[in-house]
Amino acid sequence: MRLSQLLVPTLREIPAEAEIPSHILMLKAALMRKLASGVYIYLPLGQRVLRKVEQIVREEMDRAGSQEVLMSALIPAELLKESGRWDVFGPEMFKLKDRNERDFCLGPTHEEVFTDLIRNEVKSYRQLPLILYQIQTKFRDERRPRFGVMRSREFIMKDAYSFDVDWEGLDKSFNKMYEAYCRIFDRCGLKYLVVEADSGAMGGKDSKEFMVISSIGEAVIAYCDNCGYAANEEKAECLINQEIVEEMLPKEEVYTPNVRTIEELVNFLGITPNKFVKTLIYKAKDNVVAALVRGDRDLNETKLLNILGIREEELELADASIVEKVTGAKVGFAGPIGLKGEVMIIVDNEIPQMRNFIVGANETDYHIKNVNYGRDFKADVVADIKNVIEGDKCPRCGSPLKIDRGIEVGHIFKLGTKYSDALGAKYVDEEGNEKPIIMGCYGIGINRTVAAIIEQHHDEKGIIWPMSVAPYHVIIVPVNVSNEAQNRVAEDIYAALQKEGIEVLIDDRDLRAGVKFNDADLLGIPIRITVGKKVDDGIVEIKLRENEEAEEVKISDVVEKVKNIIKEKM
């Protein structure tokens, strides 16, 4: 392809809306343009990269025995009402009515549609196991679209669903998809962790996320270098110190005038935060919940939601009037002793192993010292409701955990019979008995994968595409298009590479060499062939985008050299 004919309007300045490297570079390198908040259109180079990633996904899904289909993006409300999810998604789901006032949505996900297909088409155990997948556009009305395609309102996703006769079959399908995902992300040139995760609104269990380590990632990951344990913040656990050597002391009320926060208490009492227990009052649907965690910990609301069995929008911190009603004190002095009315107390599993900690007294301007679980108060539920922190002990081997940030590019989990029960997807077994089909779900964000690749493969000059997903493998840059010899050699190499089936760009624009080199670096094409002054000596220059060194090569050897580089890098 000739650069003079390609729609590639590169930008010199950083767009004001862009905050992270992938967003900045996808705009500067003319991969995409913004149409509306969280909505993007893809230009030729961006489309080629998307197709490259999709092709890798297709090859590995097909290799794993999955079959490609294409479902409708427009989904009738009846299907989601059958599963009970019409209201679960809340305002994130784009809802609309047709001219007959029939409710539809733009698909945020497709569990119900796949299950509906299978309940109508699969009747016997002889038709199972089965894995189907699609690459389709999804729609979610994000409250705050940000970071370009990392969190957008329209995105391309590969979603697959497995259908088996039993859990043993699901385990096999799950492992096939796990291995396929590893191959996909390896081929895309990504460094990633596979972490234990929460299934969220999709339901199911044995949930794993494929996380690309990145400082701009929205997810927090805990992992262990020693044994390989990894989990996202919503699922991460740690070992609790079981050894209690301190004796219980008599509890004592302490006057703490206008001292409300942990930080203020630390300064006022001169005691470290891990000796405090904070009590957070929540409104959970129609109930009031007191959730207790250690003073230096953050409460994990996803863990709390799972314990309560309610949706995210049904849980919120209680307002001042509710806090004052159940504690009898102003905000900042809540504690577990003497709460008024029906309050469910949920205590983090670390607290029963603590001794002589400090809590709010449920009395304005007072706290209580030397409080102990069991002696002074009890809980309705003791469970893990905290976020782990750097240095916590790994739940598997006891080594210190590390904390990092990551970008979720893939998610696999076992749905079981959640949707087959709800929609009546059954099969007849060998004995003639009807049984629910056992399902699994497997998703990859295509656009997000592209952005994650850029996050891991860029420098101050631009993108550094891995060969497997690069829009073109080679860019030829004649330094001076007015020089007949340079033009002739550049065109000859261009034709020879095309003949070999190599994806090649030629920068035939009448621009200064520096501008061309800058664009080549910005676009991130893996191999640059520079045709310059040494052309009369039969020499051109080959430079790989991933490093600074250039190599002089005989013109007669260029094609073979390029073929070998591509073979090595693919």
Swiss-Prot record:
CDD domains named among the record's database cross-references: ProRS-INS (cd04334), ProRS_anticodon_short (cd00861), ProRS_core_prok (cd00779)
Gene Ontology biological process terms, A to Z: prolyl-tRNA aminoacylation
One family name in Pfam for this protein: tRNA_edit
Major subcellular site: cytoplasm
Subcellular location: Cytoplasm
Top enzyme class: ligase
Entry keyword set: Aminoacyl-tRNA synthetase, ATP-binding, Cytoplasm, Ligase, Nucleotide-binding, Protein biosynthesis
GO cellular component terms given for this protein: cytosol
A single MF term (Gene Ontology): aminoacyl-tRNA deacylase activity
Catalytic activities: tRNA(Pro) + L-proline + ATP = L-prolyl-tRNA(Pro) + AMP + diphosphate
EC number: 6.1.1.15
Record function comment: Catalyzes the attachment of proline to tRNA(Pro) in a two-step reaction: proline is first activated by ATP to form Pro-AMP and then transferred to the acceptor end of tRNA(Pro). As ProRS can inadvertently accommodate and process non-cognate amino acids such as alanine and cysteine, to avoid such errors it has two additional distinct editing activities against alanine. One activity is designated as 'pretransfer' editing and involves the tRNA(Pro)-independent hydrolysis of activated Ala-AMP.
HAMAP family: Pro_tRNA_synth_type1 (MF_01569)
Summary of subunit composition and partner proteins: Homodimer.
Domain comment in the entry: Consists of three domains: the N-terminal catalytic domain, the editing domain and the C-terminal anticodon-binding domain.
Protein family: Belongs to the class-II aminoacyl-tRNA synthetase family. ProS type 1 subfamily.
Annotated protein name in UniProt: Proline--tRNA ligase
UniProt organism field: Thermoanaerobacter sp. (strain X514)
